[in-house]
Amino acid sequence: MIFWFCNQPPRMELFQCSWVPYSYSIVSTTSYWPSPDFSQAAFIAANAVVMGSVKIAAGASIWYGAVVRADVESIEIGECTNIQDGAILHGDPGLPTVLEDHVTVGHRAVIHSAHIERGSLIGIGAVILDGVRVGAGSIIGAGSIVTKNIPPLSLVVGVPGKVLRPITPEEAADLIQHAERYKKLALVHAGKGSDIGFYPQE
């Protein structure tokens, strides 16, 4: 087992500053919720928390430390969509969380009772709040907080998030390709492939 420790005051508890590779999947905290069907996913990290009414489409991936908690409302993860490390998906009753195909959810992003349309990218640490719909092919910049609907093909930045400019067709196409590359990388992490997707194959 590998441990990594930060330089912290000596009274800091050990587990607050360590990395531990888990050897099991956390899929439910109680038998009240059935375990989701992982059979179509490209990769589910061993220490991801995925529980409740979660629908996972073919080629989707849920990465290390992510939380997909569908205990009070459903969550749908589309084909080739990736939920990166530390991201959180949750929702309130009556407001399901939906991620369509080829969506990228960056590290530590939070999506709560929102609908993310096809080919969008949610940047690192961004927050998408209840009832928001992000239009297809959009980019939500890192750290943005989105409280209102976003038109398709929009670059959004800031707190609260505002449209900075349109996304070009070339940029939108690259967002789809980025999700495809993440699918290849996910298959390598799952032990099902050798092409990590981000470099040319020799």
Please report, for each region that a protein language model flagged, where it lies by residue.
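Short beta->alpha connector loops at strand-helix junctions that form conserved
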Residues: 72, 91-93, 167
